[in-house]
């Protein structure tokens, strides 16, 4: 089954962008996933092709209009479309590895890229848009966030990664950050590869990696560490 991605945007020229190279690019060429863009402005009805207006109640910036966006969504995703409808938004649900994995098992996604000060709340509710955030910062628009989401999803599609075990060993899959990685040369500017990693003792290697992952997570992501600790039965 091909994972079908449809992106609604004011800047379709931003796609596929980096999604056309490396793993994602090869997977798209192989038909593992497909990408369609929809120009939101094509669904404006006035001579200026307006897609935004001033915010109700006053304030800075402009807001994307519900009527224009609804027509674009209805065109891209009719009622029988089983794909989730996502709106890239800084106030959305955090994009996590578990959510990415959930999306990767589905038929695809319809992704709306917001611009300006935001999107009229009425179309978010009327078209059941799930708001998704890639982090606690503001971008110029939802397009870079959509690229991040799609890159994360595509690499988990069947056959995309050469080593199927790679995805299971990465950061977040176990609830922890990934352990440090090393490769040749054995010595770099006086720094050695940890001896345990060249010992050939797989049990000790696994123990070292687990301990390092726990330490890194505890130091750098106390939020993840708390969730991991609770899941392991801690208090």
Curated annotation (Swiss-Prot):
Subcellular location: Cytoplasm
Protein name per Swiss-Prot or TrEMBL: tRNA (guanine-N(1)-)-methyltransferase
SUPFAM superfamilies, per the entry: alpha/beta knot
Enzyme class: transferase
Residues holding S-adenosyl-L-methionine: 114, 134-139
Upper taxonomic lineage: Bacteria, Pseudomonadati, Pseudomonadota, Alphaproteobacteria, Hyphomicrobiales
Gene that specifies this protein: trmD
Family: Belongs to the RNA methyltransferase TrmD family.
Entry's Gene Ontology BP terms: tRNA N1-guanine methylation
Catalytic activity: guanosine(37) in tRNA + S-adenosyl-L-methionine = N(1)-methylguanosine(37) in tRNA + S-adenosyl-L-homocysteine + H(+)
Transmembrane segments: none
EC number: 2.1.1.228
């Amino acid at each position: 089954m091909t994972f079908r991605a449809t992106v609604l945007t004011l800047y379709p020229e931003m796609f596929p962008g980096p999604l056309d190279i490396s793993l994602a690019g090869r997977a798209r060429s192989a038909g593992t996933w497909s990408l369609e863009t929809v120009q939101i402005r094509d669904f404006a009805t006035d001579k200026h092709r307006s897609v935004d207006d001033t915010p109700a109640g006053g304030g800075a910036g402009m807001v994307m209009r519900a009527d224009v966006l609804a027509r674009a969504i209805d065109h891209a995703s009719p009622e029988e479309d089983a794909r989730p409808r996502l709106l890239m938004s800084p106030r959305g649900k955090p994009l996590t590895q578990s959510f990415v994995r959930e999306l990767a098992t589905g038929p695809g996604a319809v992704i709306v890229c917001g611009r300006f000060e935001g999107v009229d709340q009425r179309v978010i509710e009327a078209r059941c848009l799930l708001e998704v955030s890639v982090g606690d910062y503001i971008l110029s628009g939802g397009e870079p966030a959509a690229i991040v989401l799609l890159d994360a999803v595509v690499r988990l599609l069947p056959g995309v990664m050469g080593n199927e075990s790679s995805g299971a060993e990465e950061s977040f899959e176990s609830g922890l950050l990934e352990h440090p990685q090393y490769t040749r040369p054995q010595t770099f500017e006086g720094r050695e590869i940890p001896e345990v990693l060249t010992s050939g003792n797989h049990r000790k290697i696994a123990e070292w990696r687990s301990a390092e992952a726990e330490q890194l997570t505890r130091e750098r992501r106390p939020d993840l560490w708390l969730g991991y600790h609770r899941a392991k039965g801690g208090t």
